[in-house]
Amino acid sequence: MRVLVSNDDGVDAPGIQILAEALRHAGHEVMVVAPDRDRSGASNSLTLDVPIRTRRVDAQTCAVAGTPTDCVHLALTGMLDYDPDIVVSGINNSANLGDDVIYSGTVSAAMEGRFLGLPAVAVSLVTHNHQAHHYDTAARAAVEIVARLKADPLPADTILNVNVPDLAWSDVLGFEVTRLGNRHRSEPCVPQRDPRGRTVYWIGPAGPEQDAGAGTDFHAVRTGHISITPIHVDLTRYQALDTVAGWVGGLTAALDGPA
């Protein structure tokens, strides 16, 4: 298969290099198109206000001065001279569990591939304090999942969000299909003073696990399993439709009231 590989940790990150090499070793034709620096937390942002510069690192690697979504969008809308068969994003150096997926550039790169018509997988290694030890485990999981997708494709609107515990392959207890859990509210932002005495802020850490019981992605990786969560991009809150529909009469009546 022709595999487009991207990430949000940047083109020089070890995770993407190990992933690309594992996919090549499995017989795939791999093109890496990734940000020229760390763009973690970029979510689905597209660069629309300035042109995007690219740099060929080698015949199989392109660095992009943009977001993960920019990378995949450019690659699939004319920058490459061929059409890939699948998008694989990662390997991220930290978890993308639960509502992390809303902010994740790793997941968003896969999501852009799905928007543009390709099967897509996001792969993250669940590290502690960003100290990664077993990228090879996550890469092997990605190779196995890509092979399964080729043999047994999923519906066209589905992205696979894969989280791999930072364990040796022989210590992983198995794969689990999971749903997204969620976290408590994020921790407070962190104020500091710059050298000129002005206040600057760092975004605070993610909140602790909240919905993290059996069946969730949090629980799977905590118990030594590789979590596979099928996700799609329909943000409709169906449970609220009837309640909001009950407002419509009053809202419509307000149109006839005084300005």
UniProtKB/Swiss-Prot annotation:
Residues that hold a divalent metal cation according to the record: D8, D9, S40, N92
Compartments, record wording: Cytoplasm
InterPro entries on file: SurE (IPR030048), SurE-like_Pase/nucleotidase (IPR002828), SurE-like_sf (IPR036523)
Cofactor: a divalent metal cation
Gene3D superfamilies: Survival protein SurE-like phosphatase/nucleotidase
Class of this enzyme: hydrolase
Protein name as annotated: 5'-nucleotidase SurE
High-level lineage: Bacteria, Pseudomonadati, Pseudomonadota, Gammaproteobacteria, Lysobacterales
